[in-house]
A protein has these predicted regions:
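ATP/NTP-dependent adenylation/nucleotidyl-transfer catalytic domains that generate, transfer
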Residues: 20-21, 25, 196-198, 210-279
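ATP-dependent adenylation/nucleotidyltransferase module used to activate substrates
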Residues: 1-219
Length: 279
C-alpha cells in the first residue's frame, strides 16, 4: 500500500471517532480544507457533515469561487476589513509581534510587554532568562516608541473568520472540523498534537506532511487552484505576514488592478514600514 493510501485509510479511522451530524467542515477553499472536502465527499463518502465557508472579502478570486461553489452555507464577517482597520489597526510583522504592539499602543506598559519590545531577552515565569521571539527592526521600534507607528493589530482574523464561525457554532450547536496541520509552523506544531483541541474541534490532518499531501493530490488528481503555482499558502490577499517569504509581492502580482488597489489601500501603512512595493 502506498503511503498516501495508508494515510487516507488512517484518516477514515480518525473520522470514526466523531458523529458526523455533530460537526461541520470549516471550508476555506485552500489546499488543506479542500483535501478534507474531497475526502468527505469523494473518498470516504461520509454523509451528514455540512460544508461551511466564510466570505471575508479578502480571498483570492479562485479561492472565493471555490467557497461559493462547494459550501452549503457561506457566512459573512462580523466587521468589514476597513471597519477593523479603523477600530483596531492592520497586520504588519507577525501575529505574535503585532499582539504585543497592539497591547503597547492601547496603553499596556506591563513588564512582559516592555521586555519584549525593548529587548530580545525576558525573564519567564520560571525565573530564567529567555530569548524573545519578538524583535522589531530599528525603524519600527523607533516609530513605535515615539508614537509614530500606525495602528497595528492581528485582530482582522478574529473578526473576519473566527467570530462568524463562533456565532455559527453557537446557533447550530455544531463543532468544527479544521484543516490545520502541525507541519505549518512552530506555533501550530505546539498547538495541534492530536485529532482534538481542548474545545473539541476536530483536527484530523494535524500529522499530515507536505510530502504525503502532495502525493494524495497527484495520485487522485484533486483540483488545485492555479494560485498555488506561485505561492505555498493562501490566506487574505496581500497579507503582510507573507512578506518574509516574499509571498506578499507574488500575491500582489496575481491580482487585477481593482483588487490590487483595494489591498494596497488596506495594508498601505504596513507596506510602507516593510518596504513592500504595492502599486
Amino acid at each position: 500500500m502506498e503511503i498516501c493510501d495508508f494515510y487516507l485509510e488512517d484518516l477514515k479511522t480518525k473520522f470514526r471517532k466523531i458523529n458526523p451530524e455533530e460537526y461541520y467542515l470549516s471550508y476555506s477553499g485552500g489546499k488543506d480544507s479542500h483535501l478534507l472536502y474531497w475526502f468527505i465527499k469523494e473518498y470516504a463518502k461520509i454523509d451528514g457533515i455540512k460544508i461551511v465557508g466564510i466570505n471575508t472579502y479578502m480571498e483570492h478570486p479562485e479561492i472565493r469561487e471555490r467557497i461559493e461553489k462547494y459550501s452549503d452555507i457561506v457566512l459573512m464577517p462580523t466587521m468589514k476589513p476597513f471597519e477593523i482597520k479603523e477600530k483596531y489597526g492592520i497586520p504588519c510583522f507577525s501575529k505574535i509581534q503585532d499582539d504585543f504592539i497592539d497591547r503597547y499602543q492601547r496603553g499596556s506598559r506591563c513588564k512582559s510587554v516592555l521586555e519584549r519590545i525593548k529587548s530580545r531577552q525576558f525573564v519567564g515565569r520560571d525565573g530564567k532568562i529567555h530569548n524573545s521571539s519578538f524583535s522589531l527592526n530599528k525603524k519600527a521600534r523607533e516609530l513605535l516608541l515615539s508614537g509614530k507607528l500606525h495602528k497595528i493589530s492581528p485582530k482582522c482574523c478574529k473578526y473576519l473568520k473566527k467570530e462568524p464561525a463562533k456565532k455559527y457554532e453557537k446557533e447550530s450547536g455544531l463543532k468544527a472540523i479544521l484543516g490545520v496541520r502541525g507541519s505549518e509552523g512552530a506555533m501550530r506544531r505546539s498547538q495541534y498534537t492530536s485529532c482534538f483541541t481542548k474545545d473539541k474541534k476536530f483536527t484530523p490532518l494535524w500529522d499530515l506532511t507536505d510530502e504525503i499531501e502532495n502525493a494524495i493530490y497527484e495520485k487522485y488528481n484533486i483540483e488545485l487552484p492555479k494560485v498555488y503555482e506561485h505561492i505555498e499558502r493562501t490566506g487574505c490577499m496581500g497579507c503582510p505576514y507573507g512578506h518574509y517569504k516574499h509571498d506578499t509581492e507574488k500575491e500582489l502580482a496575481l491580482l487585477n488592478e481593482a483588487q490590487r488597489h483595494f489591498v494596497c489601500s488596506y495594508f498601505k501603512e504596513s507596506y510602507e514600514v516593510l518596504n513592500i512595493k504595492g502599486e
